[in-house]
């Protein structure tokens, strides 16, 4: 079991993207930073907002890339490379079209599933896809032509409340995730639904 050393929250930078569905991962990391009582600070050399806390004597770094979504890998690779963090010690939180709001699931490895942030991270890590993912359901608009506007839009309050609940569920299995106990984390998280 490899302990998590880096938790990444994907999103787009700038106030026009704040609270959009595509920024669900960034929202998770913001909530995690708040729960740990730490601030996220802009670090130009990592192309993102960075924070750090200690868990059982080990550093855990938080990162929200300030690149656009399709360049997220630039930020992840810069920080992971500097601190020599292997892909299997990275957790990436991101929005997931194929799950309804209120559902959060963990996954290890796999493809990008059409998600541009994941696509770039895989490419920038040298086609290594063994990192872990926290998939935060945002639902699907119904037709592929509507996806771009949907993910870049803000969810109605009822959907946002479901997303917030799924983030709470994910924060509830943080100890298992940090320890690298993915089986236990999945059992606990996947049994919950808002």
UniProtKB/Swiss-Prot annotation:
Keywords: Cytoplasm, Hydrolase, RNA-binding, tRNA-binding
One Pfam family this sequence matches: Pept_tRNA_hydro
Residues under site feature: Discriminates between blocked and unblocked aminoacyl-tRNA: 12
Residue positions binding tRNA: 17, 68, 70, 116
Sites marked Stabilizes the basic form of H active site to accept a proton: 95
Presence of the UniProt keyword tRNA-binding in the record: yes
GO CC annotations, alphabetized: cytoplasm
Localisation per UniProt entry: Cytoplasm
Coarse class of the protein's main subcellular location: cytoplasm
HAMAP family, A to Z: Pept_tRNA_hydro_bact (MF_00083)
Assembly: Monomer.
Identification of the protein by name: Peptidyl-tRNA hydrolase
